[in-house]
């Protein structure tokens, strides 16, 4: 299943307002999770980690928390995904929703359904880091959604250049700890800003 579900406070006009919006949504999400008798314990990166059966259940909880906060999903606050598909990949088939592995084409159709139903605005690592063709197919079939390469690029300039030529994504997650030096990281940032 999808590794992380995130919220983006699109309505915010300042950093402090963004923090306030996220705080309110997270507080409401915590209340909803408790009411459903699910655990409000958090994972390594600080997100809730309740035992739920599928991605849609997690997304439904987040949409409800946004609504309970007096906000509109897809307008005031958007849901973003970190799929971490390297962990869901077996021979270029993916288990995005269940233990069953499906083709790239079926995976793209699943992403389209999720995007439309939940107004998803950003998907990070939707396919495995070396499945360049899948990334390209997704970019060609999904518009107006940020497709973020993290594991795809690992803040590596050569991989970013390949991704640019392949039309693999329209965003990159840059992490200093992935490449090794500050100058290499800055080179990646400069190239990403140009393209």
Where is each model-derived feature located?
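Active-site mouth loops of central-metabolism enzymes
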Residues: 8-21, 51, 95-105, 150-152
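Conserved short loop/turn motifs at secondary-structure junctions
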Residues: 44-55, 124-126
């Amino acid at each position: 299943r999808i590794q992380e579900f995130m919220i983006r406070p699109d309505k915010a006009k300042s950093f402090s307002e963004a923090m306030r919006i996220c705080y309110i949504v997270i507080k409401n999400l915590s209340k909803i999770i408790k009411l459903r008798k699910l655990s409000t314990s958090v994972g390594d990166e600080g997100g809730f980690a309740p035992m739920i059966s599928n991605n849609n259940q997690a997304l439904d909880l987040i949409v409800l928390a946004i609504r309970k906060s007096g906000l509109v999903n897809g307008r005031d606050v958007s849901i973003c995904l970190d799929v971490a598909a390297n962990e869901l990949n077996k021979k270029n088939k993916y288990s995005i929703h269940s233990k069953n592995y499906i083709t790239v084409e079926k995976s793209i159709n699943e992403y389209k359904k999720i995007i439309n139903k939940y107004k998803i605005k950003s998907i990070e690592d939707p396919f495995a880091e070396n499945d360049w063709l899948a990334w390209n197919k997704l970019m060609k079939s999904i518009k107006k959604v940020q497709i973020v390469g993290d594991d795809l690029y690992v803040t590596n300039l050569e991989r970013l250049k390949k991704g640019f030529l392949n039309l693999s994504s329209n965003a990159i997650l840059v992490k200093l700890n992935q490449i090794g030096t500050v100058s290499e990281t800055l080179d990646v940032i400069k190239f990403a800003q140009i393209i």
